[in-house]
Every structure is written in C-alpha cells, then in structure tokens.
Amino acid sequence: VGGTGRYVALVDFNTNATAADAGWQDVSTEAGYTAILTAINDLKPDGGTNLDDGLQNANLLFAKSNVQEIDSKNIIALTDGEPTYYMTKDIFGNPTVGGFGNSCTKEVFEAAANTAASICNSGTTLYSICFGAANEEVKNPNTGAYISLFEYLNTYIALNKTYSANDFSGLTDAFDAISSSITSGLSSGTVHDSLPDGVTCISGDFEGNRNLTGATGEPGEGGVTTYTYTK
C-alpha cells in the first residue's frame, strides 16, 4: 500500500557514526515503519559520543535520490551525554576521530556546533533531545564557564529547539512535540496555477506572486487536505 511519503532514516553515533542499513523508509507504510522500528531495536550502547559525526552522517542522507526533492528536511539528535569525540583529519588529509572520549574538549565543543550551524544554514531544521543528562556540565571554551548539557544543545546545536527527557514518558512527549512542530510547518506552501482556456493576460498585471485568500480546506483520506479557492 502506498504511503504519504513520511521518510525516516536512522544514524547511530558513539565513537563514530553509522547510518542504519534500513536507509530511508516511508514510515506511513507498515513495511517502512517496521524496518525503522527494527533498526531502533538493534541499537547497542557503546563508548563515547561523536555528535559531530552523527550530524554529518544524518545530513549526508539528504543527498539520497528518494528524498532530494522533499522540501521539509529535519534532523532530530538524541543524546544521553555530552559530546566527547569529533571528526578531524590525519596528516594525510583523511577523516579520523579526534577527542579523548571522556570529556567535551574545546575541539569537540566547536566541531559539533559548527556542523550544526552548517546544517541549519542549508535549510534543514535541527532538533535535539537531551535524555537523562540535562544537568550534565559542559565547559564553554569561549567563556571558561560550565553550562548544562541542555543549554549547550539549546544554544549551539538546536537553537531553541531542544527538549529534555528523563524517562520514557518524557521521551514520548519530546517526540510528540517535535512531530507536531514538523507537521505544522507543512501547512503553508506555494501554488502554481495557470489561466483557464480563452483567458489571456494583456497588461501583465498577473505577473508575480499572489496571496491565496479565502481558501477552504477539506481533510480527506491519508491525512491529505484539499484546498478549494476561486480565481
């Protein structure tokens, strides 16, 4: 059965990051939902937190052909601790993991923040969830002061789009809030229309954009709303 095109992919990050073999799945279909759920259940905890590499790998997934044309692109970064690794290059220019794995150094702090800024500047919306570690402290290399992990994420990773959760209920609430934010952003768009047969534009007054007013929407099957308006 065809879905509504709600594509989800999963990236696991610890010492480094790996995209799940499931790739992009349309979770509005039973098969796609099951594939992503299986990938989530297959996750195993491991050492370190390479948030930088996790964000980079998530962003690379948007280059896949089945999602390239989708306008609304979102990344949700879920972490249970401060970042402790980052991506750098060795003496030959090859990508390698940097950091000590037990603390958020200046390089780790800035690498994840710079990657997040680059992602947001490209038009992708970035959310983060701090799970069970909101009060964990991270040293801000710019000031020398310690800030909470929540503040770091909410200021340098997902600006004003960070949620805190301490248990399963809180995690569910966070994802519900993010889902609501994502879907509410789909309520606007651009309509390209043409003049009916027998009507021509002489003065050019129809050129440019026009606001669509007086449109009425009627929800239909599969969450699709049809808007009707009069020219």
Where are these regions (language model features)?
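Short, flexible, mixed-charge acidic loops at enzyme active sites
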Residues: 23-33, 143, 153
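C-terminal "exit" segments of structured domains
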Residues: 161-230
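VWA/integrin I-like adhesion module and closely mimicked acidic/polar interface patches used
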Residues: 42-49, 53-60, 70-74, 79-181
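Short regulatory alpha-helical segment in sensory/regulatory domains of signaling proteins that mediates
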Residues: 2-3, 66, 182
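Generic structural signal for alpha-helix termini and adjacent loop/cap motifs
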Residues: 61-65
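Extracellular beta-sheet repeat scaffolds used for adhesion and glycan interaction
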Residues: 28-31, 35-41, 92-103, 206-231
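Von Willebrand factor
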Residues: 1-27, 73-79, 124-133
